[in-house]
Structures are given as C-alpha cells and as structure tokens.
Regions:
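Membrane-embedded alpha-helical bundles of multi-pass transporters/translocases
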Residues: 5-519
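Soluble N-terminal domains of membrane-associated systems
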Residues: 1-3
C-alpha cells in the first residue's frame, strides 16, 4: 500500500504534488488542535456563564416583582423595550467584533473587558437599596440594571463563536459541542440550591437572613464565579481559524454583507425555530411562582430537579450518535415533537391528579410530587438533544454562508441571528410579565419580608397553564419549523465536498499571488 502511494506521488509533477499535499492536509480531520488546558478553560467558561445565566433567567423576574416591588406589567414592558434596544445594539456589536483585530485575537478581548459591566449589573438585579422609595425610582433602578446586564452580555457572548474558531477540525468541533453541552448540566447545580436556601435559611437564622438576602447573596456568588472563569478563559484559549485580512473584509461592503446574511435560508429557518423555542422561557419564568404557590414550597422544585436532570447525563453523550444516524435536523425535529407531546400530557393530567389532604387538595403530598417529578423527567428528555443539535445546525449555517457567498462572516451571521433572537426575546419577555398579571397575581409579603403563598384557584390554575402549555407550544413549533432547514442529507454532503474544493482553490490562488509577488 505504501509502495502504491509512493508510485502515485512520484508520477505527479511538483505543482500537482503540492495540491495533493494540500488536499491531504485539508482532509486531516483526526488531527488534534486543542490542548487539554484549552478544553478545561472552555468548559469552565461554559460552567461559569451557565451558572450566571441560569440564576438570572430563573430568578430575576420573581425577585423584581416580589422584592423590588414593581408590577408584572412594568417588568414585562421593561424587558420588551430592552430587547428591542438589545437587538439594535447587537447589529452594531456584531460588526465591531467581526472587524476587531488585536494581538489577543478577534473574540478573546471581549471575554475580559465586559466583566465589570455585567458583573455590576448582576449585583443591581438582585438588590433593593433602601433609597428606592417610590415606584418610579424602582422602575428606573430595574431599567438600568436590565439594560446594563444585557449590554455587557451582547459583547461578552462573542466567546460563543470561539467554539467555531479554536479548531479547524469539524470532528473536534462537534465533540467539543457535545462535551460543553454535557458540562452545562453541571452548571445548573449551584443555582438549583437557591430554593433550598430561600426556604430554610430564614428559619434557621430566625429571620436574620430573609429570602431577599439569600437571592442577593447568590447574585454576588454567581457574578464572582462567572467573572473568574471568563478571565481564565481569556488567558488559556487560542483562536486558530485564520481570519480574513482587513483588505479582504473591505472587498465585501457592510451593506452587501447584510444582504448576503438576509438571503441565508437555513439561518432564517434556525431563527424562526429559535423564536418559537423561546416561548419555553415564558413557562420557565413562572417556575418559582408555580413551585411556591401551587405546591407550597420552592424546595419542591429543587427536589424534582435532582431527578429530572439525571437522564440528560446519559442522553447528551448519545446525541452525537443520533446525529450521525439521523442527521442534526431530523434529530432536532423528533426531539421537538416529543417534547411538545410530553408537556401537553402534563397539562391534561394536571399537577395534582391525586387529591390529598383537605381544602380540595391544597396539601400537595408525596404521591403528587412523585408523579410531577416523573412527568417533568419525561418532558426534559429532549432538552440537551435540542441544545446540541442547535449548536451543530449553527455550524451548518456558517458553512452554508461560506459555500454560498465565499465569506464565512461568522460574527455578521451571529449578529443577524441575535438581532431577530432579541426581537423574539422582547415578545417572550413581555409575555412573561404580562401573563403573571393576566392570571390575577398580586405579590404579598409578611412582616419579615417573605412572600405569602397564593391560594386563589384561578391564579393557581393560571400559573400551571403557563408552566405547562407555553413549553408545549414552544417544542411543537420548534420541531415543525426545522422541517424547512435545507442543509441536511445529500445536499449537505455535496455542499461540504464543494466547499472543500473552493477552500483549496482559494489556497492555491493565495499561494500563486504570493509567488508572483516574490518573483517580481
């Protein structure tokens, strides 16, 4: 075999042999580029940011309505307006990031220079200064905190694109995607302790530490963890995918770049699926209300979470095999439909099918808790599958953009994606606050500042409807939307082969131009 290869190579003239070597080098998908230290850094950054985002997303609305004292309508309007602003800001930040050139790379600097912005904003999100006496002052405080947090994250989230830049190997990239999504599961452990501390610490300390103080303490802790891991990631990670020069970037104007991005069909299908998938966050934002008021304790949510997340540790490592067998698109479609059916069944059977205790079953009971945990476990089975598939499909969008228009422009594609994503968030953010108002909930606290449990059946049924039906709608529409994602199957195989040829032609052209300059 080696002799045949040697004869074949000997028969080639020097130029053909050079091309053959280029092809062999370009096809070398088994080569390892990422060092172990970088894998650790990327996973730690993922861990830190997952901790922070999980904590903020799950508790911000509950804290601001229950302790800061703003209404659900005011909160929803703030999030709605901020999301519109954030969408416009992302358009600018994407262009700035795409054209950034520093000795530390294009993306890494934003991992460290944004830390003070979102770090301070996180502290503001979970504090209620005594100087805030009226509704107007409280709303202004909330506006500054929410706007500053999302502004910092608009630029910091450039680190997500590092996933597609720290290695040119598709195999390494896909493996890192699956590993990072698996590691994200660990990133929910610390935030999951919040309900336990909120429930028991005020009792243990005889009211010296109230519920509000627990949320504030966790906010500080999450900000410190996220900041430390981000700084470590900045120093440990490297960018390896070659960047286009400033001259090459200028060949395609900003307007043309936006036109190319807008005409990117798979990108828009992914945007639409993400828009519908975002409605699950409306249900997620009601979790604290549901567990406290419907079941009687926030701890119930933590107990359920200990079991509902366990299957993900098995399913996430298996997801690459599912993608290899069925394709990322088809796997995502199946996961979405499965999740929609599961959440619909959860709503049909209600959250307490077994009436226990007095007052029409207001005492939740162990049997109901076991049932709810089992149902939520089934509902959560496709979660990690969807997250892995989304990351893989995002890589397909970048590849399609390079194949179709000749320029990868990841930051620009991410900009357009984020633009529409933030517009979608404005809708779901508005719904999150408005839905709480629609069900008729008004927060009440006792003398120690702790939230008093709601008992009105109409309000409790409203909480559960948001909790179950919004995720059901989100999962169904997510799966259905991806039917129109065209980068899959034979088309994807042919596209990647053609893209490899185009890359080789680009390399040969650059080498030829370099040789001409050397001769002259």
């Amino acid at each position: 075999m080696e002799e045949d290869t040697a004869v074949k190579t000997a028969d080639l003239d020097p130029s053909e042999q050079e091309i053959e070597e280029e092809v062999e080098k370009a096809s070398e998908q088994n080569r390892r580029f990422i060092r172990p230290r970088e894998i650790v850094a990327f996973l730690l950054t993922t861990f830190g940011q997952k901790n922070l985002s999980q904590f903020v997303d799950a508790n911000r609305q509950f804290f601001m309505i229950s302790f800061l004292g703003i209404s659900g309508k005011a909160y929803g309007l703030i999030v709605f307006l901020e999301s519109i602003y954030d969408a416009l800001d992302d358009s600018l930040s994407g262009l700035i990031i795409d054209r950034t050139r520093t000795r530390w790379g294009r993306l890494r600097p934003y991992m460290i220079i944004t830390v003070p912005v979102w770090g301070i904003a996180t502290l503001m999100l979970f504090t209620t200064p005594a100087m805030l006496s009226g509704q107007t002052q409280k709303i202004i405080w909330a506006v500054i905190a929410i706007f500053a947090y999302n502004l910092g994250m608009s630029y910091f989230n450039a680190w997500n694109i590092l996933l597609y830049n720290i290695t040119p190997s598709l195999k390494e990239r896909d493996n890192l995607i699956a590993t990072s999504k698996f590691f994200e599961l660990i990133g929910v452990w610390i935030p999951s302790l919040v309900p336990i501390f909120v429930t028991f610490l005020p009792k243990i300390t005889n009211g010296k530490v109230g519920m509000e103080g627990v949320y504030s303490g966790f906010g500080i802790g999450m900000a410190i963890i996220a900041a430390f891991t981000a700084v470590y990631g900045f120093f440990a990670l490297r960018e390896r995918v070659p960047l286009a020069s400033r001259e090459q970037m200028q060949e395609i104007g900003i307007i043309d770049s936006f036109k190319n991005a807008i005409k990117n069909r798979p990108m828009f299908v992914l945007i639409i699926s993400g828009f519908f998938g975002g409605f699950k966050s409306v249900g997620a934002s009601s979790e604290s209300f549901f567990w406290l008021h419907n079941t009687g304790s926030l701890v119930n949510g933590t107990i359920a979470g200990l079991f509902t997340g366990l299957p993900n540790y098995i399913i996430t490592p298996l997801t690459p095999k599912l993608i290899h067998k069925f394709g990322a698109r088809n796997t995502a479609i199946g996961a979405g439909i499965f999740g929609g059916i599961a959440y619909t069944l959860l709503f049909v059977f209600t959250y307490q099918p077994f009436k226990i205790g007095t007052d029409n079953g207001t005492k939740y009971g162990i049997v109901n808790m076991v049932y709810m945990t089992l149902m939520l476990t089934i509902c959560g089975l496709p979660n990690c599958v969807i997250r892995v598939c989304q990351a893989v499909l995002q890589g397909d969008v970048y590849d399609y953009s390079e194949w179709k228009y000749g320029v990868r422009n990841e930051a620009l594609v991410a900009t357009v994606t984020n633009y529409f994503g933030k517009l979608a968030n404005s809708v779901t953010g508005l719904l999150s606050g408005v839905m709480i108002t629609i069900v008729g909930y008004v927060a009440h606290t006792d003398a120690l500042g702790n939230v008093v449990r709601e008992t009105a059946p109409s309000v409790l049924n409203g909480f559960f409807a948001i909790f179950a039906l919004m995720p059901a709608f989100a999962r169904f529409m997510f799966g259905i939307s991806l039917i129109f994602f065209n980068v899959h199957g034979k088309f994807k195989e042919d596209m990647l082969k053609d893209l490899e040829v185009k890359r080789l032609e680009r390399v040969r052209k650059m080498q030829a131009e370099s040789n001409d300059e050397t001769i002259s």
